[in-house]
């Protein structure tokens, strides 16, 4: 506060909150991380019905996915991603909170992978980006960083993308998705 700055801590684990409380600091939740244990993940049974339905509906309507880095995607796809992102940002009253989720610049990183939902007409309806996570120098997971959906896109496209990402990662031997 010496220069008018207010220090802040982000992504604090719950067990540390009493320390901050004892110093008189306030805290609030910006969001919560969901961690999916991929070896056990599937879309079978009543418990997964709300995840399975958007996947089944999207596939029935001709939706498919494409996975790759920004450089691996065609120019036609990257232009659509940029258009979707620009439209999404323009609709928001506030600027993006870059400290919680990434933007288009991070999606271009060569280590980041994108999963696109592409409809039967070849139009991108949604996109997610995934940053690799590492344990002891070995990639063990992917972390969701960027989510965009076409303004006129079908309901359930994000559920479709996240479920398809989980299944793909599981099949590739990845342990964790968050």
What function would you assign to each model-found segment?
Residues 1, 5, 9-33, 38-54, ...:
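A conserved beta-strand-loop-helix scaffold within acyl/acetyltransferase catalytic domains
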């Amino acid at each position: 506060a010496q220069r008018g700055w207010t220090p802040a801590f982000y992504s604090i684990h719950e067990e540390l909150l009493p320390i901050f409380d004892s110093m008189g600091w306030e805290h609030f939740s910006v969001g919560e991380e969901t961690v999916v244990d991929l070896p056990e993940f599937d879309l079978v049974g009543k418990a997964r019905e709300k995840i399975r339905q958007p996947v089944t509906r999207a596939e029935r309507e001709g939706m498919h996915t494409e996975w790759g880095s920004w450089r691996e995607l065609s120019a036609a796809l990257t232009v659509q991603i940029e258009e979707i992102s620009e439209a999404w940002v323009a609709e928001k009253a506030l600027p993006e909170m870059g400290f919680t989720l990434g933007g288009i610049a991070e999606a271009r990183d060569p280590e980041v992978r994108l999963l696109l939902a592409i409809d039967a007409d070849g139009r991108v309806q949604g996109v997610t980006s995934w940053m690799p996570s590492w344990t002891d120098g070995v990639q063990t997971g992917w972390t969701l960083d960027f989510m965009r959906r076409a303004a006129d896109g079908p309901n359930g496209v994000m559920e479709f993308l996240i479920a398809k990402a989980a299944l793909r990662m599981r099949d590739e031997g990845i342990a964790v998705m968050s």
